[in-house]
Amino acid sequence: MRITGAVLERCDAPTPYAESRPVTVGPLELDPPQAGEVLVRIEVAGLCHSDLSVVDGNRVRPVPMLLGHEAAGVVEATGPGARLAVGQRVVMTFLPRCGQCAECATDGRLPCSVGSAANGAGTLVGGGRRLSRAFVPGGAGGVQEVHHHLGVSAFASHAVVSETSVVPVDPDVPPEVAALLGCAVLTGGGAVVNAGRPAPGDRVAVVGLGGVGMAALLVAVALGHEVIGVDAVPAKLELARELGAATAVGPQEAVDRWLRAPVVVEAAGSARAFETAYALTAPGGTTVTVGLPHPDARASISPLSLTAEARTVVGSYLGSAVPSRDIPRYVELWRAGRLPLDALVSDRITLDELPVALDRLASGEALRQLVIF
């Protein structure tokens, strides 16, 4: 079928992206779903820092690639053996879980090796690609395969994905809420619940108040924890206070005031943010790093403090989540009025506005910009 989507043509394009235009919006061909796959009509897709990290070259992926990994939509067709019904609303998650590998047996601590390999290759978890487009190399007509982004490729009117990349939700969950569950909430909330595991009454600090960090803050507040929000952007600190943070300050002030917590989540994806998060971690506490810095980034911490203060440092990919287990938990918090996810939405945009939206995200001024279809 013919669809419209946003394709990344090159990595490491110069900013501003509104001028360099590394992403083009145009027609593509989408093959029907194969065994264990579903065709999803995309309703809403979120623009995340993981999208930006591919565009700016921090996370190199094969191109051309149809971007987008955080989304919600409705199943319109199914391949052989698929269990989902047509008409079912689903949350799309960016790490398929085969359920069979040794990594899947770690209950979310490690990402699925099968899904990770497919994501790195730009294929679906079952192998192969379902996307292509007309191509004119040197003036001769042809067809070019287009890679999938993290098994989803949600910046399009439709997507074919493995059933292992989606989680069904009830129709009362609006698509804008459902989309946020697939990455921001799974990652940020999971960093708190699955990796940090604060005890009742423990204070939680979050360093980096983008979409993932603010989601971590929301989940921690929903679970009754006193929360410290840390960010360099004053508007984000103000929003953190509005969303229930007991304290919201800049990084240097947090260190100067010795605002320590038993659980500290680093969600900025930078070495300096990691150092700040470690400095704010109380003796015996846990530093959870969920951000994705450049592969060459290096941080400096004191090994003596790690030993003498019995500290723990935990890496948490996708919030150490098992999506089929965790998404229903967040839905229940939302239904109870304890998880105001609409507060994460900073802008609603169209596909054609993606280059400008990428610039806003890179500047640090945006939380979650949602592409509405």
PLM feature segments, named:
Residues V255-V264:
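A short acidic, Gly/Pro-enriched loop at the edge of an enzyme's catalytic core
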